[in-house]
Amino acid sequence: MKRIIYAISLGVLLAIPVLSQAIDTTPMIRVTNVHNGQSDESLDTFTETKFFGPYQFRVLKDAIETQGETKDIDGRVFRTSDGVFMHVKARSIDGNSMSLDNEIKNLVKERTIPEPTVKMVLPIKDSVIEVNNDGVRSLLAEFMYGWPLKNRTDMVLVTDYEGTRYYDKLQFYRDRLPNGVRIEQLREMIMDAQFSYK
């Protein structure tokens, strides 16, 4: 009887480290970004969560993942029939990389110069919002374009996290929003980009 009890005790002692390792290897923890004290729970009804490396982001449920749309995209690209376009990409940062603020300044500067192939593509408004996602600092640059793209809005969320810089971009046309989706919800969608970690 003592041998049986000893064997069971030994088995439990050996199993505990294995179980703890199994728990440790589950890296995904869902966190929800609350921007300005608000969280839109209805996002779950028309969006779904995707993962890109350790990055967690939202796309519209009817979005189809596409490839090769533009040369500068090296991440994942999604497009809906409503004209909503979203892509996520990540790149490593070296020690000489510019700060997050300077990255945004360059982004704003680049987008206020007309594209060579399109006339008069100038933002009529651009703004930068700081977003704090569970202690991780992100900057959201939003652009509303003038003629001929007067109804287009682009949003780019840029984040540094553990040595990697992440870009989350959403582009849509305000006269062709997805059915039942408000512009504020699309904005919340990109700001809800989160990290799954630990």
Would you name each region that the model predicts?
Residues 97-102:
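Short, conserved charged micro-motifs
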Residues 1-4:
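Positively charged n-region of N-terminal signal peptides that target proteins for export
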